[in-house]
Design a protein with these regions (language model features):
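Short, contiguous alpha-helical
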Residues: 2-26, 72-128, 167, 171-218
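A short small-residue
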Residues: 27-34, 76-78, 129-137
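Solvent-exposed interaction patches of small proteins and small membrane subunits
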Residues: 37-48, 79-82, 112-114, 139-140, ...
């Protein structure tokens, strides 16, 4: 595990909030995951995170899928990254759109005209971008959201595979990754948010169960 997360983003502050909650924290519900230290571990973490997300989705009842998220009782359970997601579709689309952004970031570097990871208009307030990404997909069906995420996840795996170990894990190897490495960017749009999404869905299902118990007791 990395000794510090303080160097991540201004662009670097964003990575701090996106990459490390799953890797740096440990509690009774979720043991801290070792941060990938090589390409094989990175690819395994990406694949494992996606598999666990799908396992959690498969456990959801129709009621859990159709009932909007409600974290009003404990907003911290939701976190700022997911504050605009109101259902499973929103959550999956959110993941998909951040992976699209990652592909564009890498493609721009490889085509010789690199730019910062975040679009200029959202560099100081990326939460507004989160809101925009979710809002533009309000007519997207859930099954389409699942398909889009599956496609872009597979592209993320192939994209990560195309990098060498040095390119992935050398801090500052690419100018536009600043003081961190390319692997952290892959983590920030795959394994880390996959784990956060699983926790969010578990909390949603727990909230539904608690609400039903209160109704039954009343």
């Amino acid at each position: 595990m990395r000794s510090s997360i303080k160097y991540y983003f201004d662009e670097e502050t964003v990575l701090e909030s996106l990459v490390f909650p799953i890797f740096a924290e440990s509690n009774d519900e979720h043991k801290a995951m070792p941060y990938p230290s090589n390409k094989q571990e990175l690819l395994a973490a990406m694949a494992d995170g996606y598999a666990k997300l799908n396992e959690q989705i498969a456990k959801m009842s129709e009621e859990a899928i159709s009932t909007p998220f409600d974290f009003a009782a404990d907003p911290k359970k939701c976190g700022v990254r997911w504050q605009y997601d109101r259902c499973l579709r929103d959550l999956l689309i959110h993941l998909y759109e951040w992976q699209v952004l990652m592909r564009e970031f890498v493609n721009n570097i490889r085509e010789g005209h690199p730019r910062d990871y975040l679009p200029d208009e959202y560099r100081k307030n990326y939460h507004e971008m989160d809101k925009m990404l979710v809002e533009k997909h309000q007519s997207t069906p859930l099954e389409e959201a699942k398909r889009l995420l599956q496609e872009t996840h597979e592209k993320m795996l192939r994209l990560a595979e195309s990098f060498t170990e040095e390119e992935l894990f050398t801090k500052g190897y690419y100018k536009n990754t600043y003081t961190t490495d390319m692997a952290a960017y892959f983590v920030s749009v795959t394994s880390s948010p996959y784990g956060q999404a699983v926790k969010l869905l578990k909390t949603h299902q727990k909230n539904l169960k608690t609400a039903k118990s209160k109704i039954q007791r009343s």
